Curated annotation (Swiss-Prot):
PROSITE patterns: C2, DH_1, DH_2, PH_DOMAIN, RHOGAP. One of its GO terms (molecular function) is GTPase activator activity. This is Active breakpoint cluster region-related protein. Residues 91-284 form the DH domain. Residues 27-84 are annotated as: Disordered. It comes from Bos taurus (Bovine). The gene is ABR. Protein with a unique structure having two opposing regulatory activities toward small GTP-binding proteins. The C-terminus is a GTPase-activating protein domain which stimulates GTP hydrolysis by RAC1, RAC2 and CDC42. Accelerates the intrinsic rate of GTP hydrolysis of RAC1 or CDC42, leading to down-regulation of the active GTP-bound form. The central Dbl homology (DH) domain functions as guanine nucleotide exchange factor (GEF) that modulates the GTPases CDC42, RHOA and RAC1. Promotes the conversion of CDC42, RHOA and RAC1 from the GDP-bound to the GTP-bound form. One of its GO terms (cellular component) is dendritic spine. Residues 301-459 form the PH domain. Residues 647-845 form the Rho-GAP domain.
Length: 859
């Protein structure tokens, strides 16, 4: 038997549909970013996996990757005793009224299905039967029992809803209905056989074909339409659909029932029975993908699907890509009018027998795609973070739902643009009979997954073919029902009760790897998800000619709502004929890849957690620990009198008899000497062990500092400079002036802003000011090489802003409640402050001190 509903988002209950003004799933947004109205899903010909999750809780409906048991959802919390009880009971009546109306329609559908059964039975014993008794019992199995159960339920519930008062009870009716769900188990077990029997009988008997194609269903009592025509196949699907609907309404009822109401425990029990029933049904179902049959009778199954960015005619388009057993199909969601069933529009397809991956040389000849400017991507991230903060404030202040929906809509639009414009890793495919296609991905892990899935299918004996227009229409039509990825991967598609992810710093040590069959030049990369998509964050050095590399390299990775860590192991390619000049075209061979969930309970400890990840027969050992953002705000002064890290900048400059600390001058000099053209300088993490070694040398004032600097990786030197500023007992721009910097950057009038921002610089202690001005000029020189190093002023402000300017621990506790809020509330302003000074004409210390044009009251 095929699996019973759509995986991913469960269907909305009627009450959620009634009150939601805007939906943020992929179903409502087409590939060019236009809103679309969502129509109700139609009954599928094959049975989708029964959705046993509560409404709007995608994380509960998704089954585990390994095909294990589905997660049993927690019953929703009811209203606290006396809390908005009147409003809750009114909502309860609305829920029941809507459910009662749908129950009437369902009973009419069952009646229509039963109507031909009696005359068919009557002819079965004659000399010219339409169907045999056995065929009739197979097709209509348990329909009569289901009808009687629901008719009794409807007759008992209807008067209670029509004569409504706050004391009415009906929990016992739902409890009884749930206790009779066993009859559905028998129906589900027989469903596929019933469909096949009905289809065979239609093909062999014209009389039954006419009956099954036009069954008359009575309209509701208040409806203008007296009857509608429905096929028998569609009506046989209705009980499958209904069993999920009953569970959804129990969630809605519990949500709007006070916990001290007599119905509450009865409804809880009914929900428990229903969920257990759905779980038991789904455990019995073969978890194979629902299949589509080709005209030749071959089985075509969906293997993989997902959202990818395609470059088409020079512009980026979001596509939904479907990989079947013999064909790759690229589609976009059609724009449809309200109430119409949503469909996909096929943009192109390639039979896997004709699909080839171009060589690096062929890829190099392909038109290159210019990446979206980094500063614009950073601006989008800042906007998203600010909108998240506004939404949290509205919720905390119990703001109007319309205002929250407007903010959510804005956030979705910005996240959609970020998702569309951030990917840069090319994934090229070619049809040997014609055109080439280009997708852009944000993760090499994801590119590898698609490539491997296609290559695995291509090992089979595949034949080339051309789909007729009808065949293509049927295949494209099946995509809506078969898809496993329902939503664009953006954070605004998450429910409020889902984990927001981790915000802070993840320290990862990549120790070693085992399991390689022959010696190779090996390295690892680390990816984490951020804003809904994965990005590469760190890379180990290459360990040459070995089967057991021992890297023992530590990295500090900033997390922004992250939930997963990916580790990829590569064999380095030194053959220049295979190296693509495109920076984003990774041609090194992936030896293995793996992913782990960043469980807050596991990683949010002060201690290191060591683990092993297995990938393709390879075992990589690593350790990690996590520091939350609020913890990272704490600056611990150094207990030792000597050294430079964690020591006040005024103490260091006085001891050294210098205006700028020696460590700052030496790191800046080395970066400008040999790192100013390094791609991603200051953004790419240096090896943590190298940084710690440099820290120890500077703290000890070792005479070999200069020699060590000249031999050290430039990213480690850049990382040492960032670490120095981060470990200052207070940030370079001081705790005292932090609120004033926040207010100054928010001023609208340019003259007032200039006056305020210059006065604030003058208010800094001399060592802080001179060091800040020295760093400013250095960062401007780095940005001058942006065409080569890809580091704009905005990128540099994003890296250094939160390090040089941070709220004090007291300040952050007084105003903010969560780590996510700290990030979204402050980082935008911190970046803007530094960017203001970076974009300002050169500022001289002497001129700043004596200039009387800048005037302001004391801060």
């Amino acid at each position: 038997m095929e699996p019973l509903s759509h995986r991913g988002l469960p269907r909305l209950s009627w009450i959620d549909t009634l009150y939601s003004n805007f939906s943020y799933g992929a179903d409502d947004y087409d590939a060019e970013g236009n809103e679309e109205q969502k129509g109700p899903p139609e009954g599928s010909e094959t049975m989708p996996y029964i959705d046993e999750s509560p409404t709007m809780s995608p994380q509960l409906s998704a089954r585990s990757q390994g095909g294990g048991d589905s997660i049993s959802p927690t019953p929703p919390e009811g209203l606290a005793p006396g809390v908005e009880a009147g409003k809750g009971l009114e909502m309860r009546k609305l829920v029941l009224s809507g459910f009662l109306a749908s129950e009437e329609i369902y009973i009419n559908q069952l009646e229509a299905l039963l109507l031909p059964m009696k005359p068919l039975k009557a002819t079965a014993t004659t000399s010219q039967p339409v169907l045999t008794i056995q065929q009739i019992e197979t097709i209509f199995y348990k329909i009569q029992d289901i009808y009687e159960i629901h008719k009794e339920f409807y007759d008992n519930l209807c008067p209670k809803v029509q004569q409504w008062d706050s004391q009415v009870t009906m929990g016992h009716l739902f409890q009884k209905l749930a206790s009779q769900l066993g009859v559905y188990k028998a129906f589900v077990d027989n469903y596929k056989v019933a469909l096949e029997t009905a289809e065979k009988c239609s093909q062999s008997n014209n009389q039954f074909q006419k009956i099954s194609e036009e069954l008359k269903v009575k309209g509701p009592k208040d409806s203008r339409d007296s009857h509608t025509s429905v096929t028998m196949e569609a009506l046989l699907y209705k009980p499958i659909d209904r069993v999920t609907r009953s569970t959804l309404v129990l969630h809605d009822l519990l949500k709007h029932t006070p916990v001290d109401h007599p119905d509450y425990p009865l409804l809880q029990d009914a929900l428990r029975i229903s969920q257990n029933f759905l779980s038991s049904i789904n455990e019995d179902i073969d978890p194979r993908r629902t299949a589509v049959t080709t005209p030749k009778g071959e089985t075509r199954q969906l293997v993989k699907d997902g959202f990818l960015v395609e470059v088409s005619e020079g512009s980026r388009k979001l596509r939904h890509v479907f990989l079947f057993t013999d064909v790759l199909l690229c589609a976009k969601l059609k724009k449809t009018s309200a109430g119409k069933h949503q469909q996909y529009d096929c943009k192109w397809y390639i039979p896997l027998a004709d699909l080839v991956f171009p060589s690096p040389e062929e890829s190099e000849a392909s038109p290159q795609v210019h990446p979206f400017p980094d500063h614009e991507l950073e601006d989008m991230k800042m906007k998203i973070s600010a909108l998240k903060s506004e939404i949290q404030k509205e919720k905390a202040n119990k703001g109007q739902s319309r205002a929250i929906e407007r903010l959510k809509k804005k956030m979705f639009e910005n996240e959609f643009l970020l998702l569309l414009n951030s990917p840069t890793i090319p994934f090229r495919i070619h049809n040997r009979n014609g055109k080439s296609y280009l997708f852009l991905l944000s993760s090499d892990y994801e590119r590898s997954e698609w490539r491997e899935a296609i290559q695995k299918l291509q090992k089979k004996d595949l034949q080339a073919f051309v789909l007729s227009s009808v065949e293509l229409q049927v295949l494209t039509g099946s995509c809506f029902k078969l898809r496993t990825v329902h939503n664009i991967p953006v954070t605004s598609n998450k429910d409020d009760d889902e984990s927001p992810g981790l915000y802070g710093f993840l320290h990862v040590i990549v120790h070693s790897a085992k399991g390689f069959k022959q010696s190779a030049n090996l390295y690892c990369t680390l990816e984490v998800d951020s804003f809904g998509y994965f990005v590469s964050k760190a890379k180990t050095r290459v360990f040459r000619d070995t089967t057991e590399p021992k890297w023992d390299e530590e990295f500090e990775i900033e997390l922004e709502g992250s939930q997963s860590l990916r580790i990829l192991c590569y064999e380095k390619c030194y053959d220049k004929t295979k190296v693509n000049k495109d920076n984003n075209e990774i041609v090194d061979k992936i030896m293995g890849k793996g992913q782990i969930q960043l469980d807050p309970q596991t990683v949010e400890t002060k201690n290191w957690h060591t683990d092993v990840i297995e990938m393709n027969g390879i075992k990589v050992e690593f350790s990690m620990k996590f520091t939350s953002r609020d913890m990272s705000l704490k600056r611990t002064p150094s207990k030792k009198q000597s050294g430079v890290f964690g020591v006040k900048i005024s103490v260091v400059t006085k001891r050294e008899r210098s205006k700028v600390p020696y460590i700052v001058r030496q790191c800046v000099e080395e970066v400008e000497k040999r790192g100013i053209e390094e791609v991603g300088i200051y953004r790419i993490s240096g090896v943590a062990t190298d940084i710690q070694a440099l820290k120890a040398v500077f703290d000890a004032n070792n005479k070999d500092i200069l020699l060590m600097l000249s031999d050290m990786d430039i990213n480690a030197i850049a990382g040492t400079l960032k670490l120095y500023f981060r470990e200052l007992p207070e940030p370079l721009l001081t705790d005292r002036l932090y609120p004033a910097f926040m207010e100054g950057i928010a001023l609208s009038d340019p003259a007032a802003k200039e006056n305020c921002m210059m006065h604030l610089l003058r208010s800094l202690p001399d060592p802080n000011l001179i060091t800040f001005l020295f760093l400013l000029e250095h960062l401007k020189r780095v940005a001058e090489k942006e065409p080569v190093n890809k580091m704009s002023l905005h990128n540099l402000a994003t890296v250094f802003g939160p390090t040089l300017l941070r709220p004090s621990e007291v300040e952050s506790k007084a105003h903010l409640t969560s780590a996510a809020d700290i990030w979204s509330h402050d980082v935008m302003a911190q970046v803007q402050v530094l960017l203001y000074y970076l974009q300002h004409p050169p500022i001289s210390f002497a001129e700043l001190k004596r200039n009387t044009l800048y005037f302001s009251t004391d801060v």
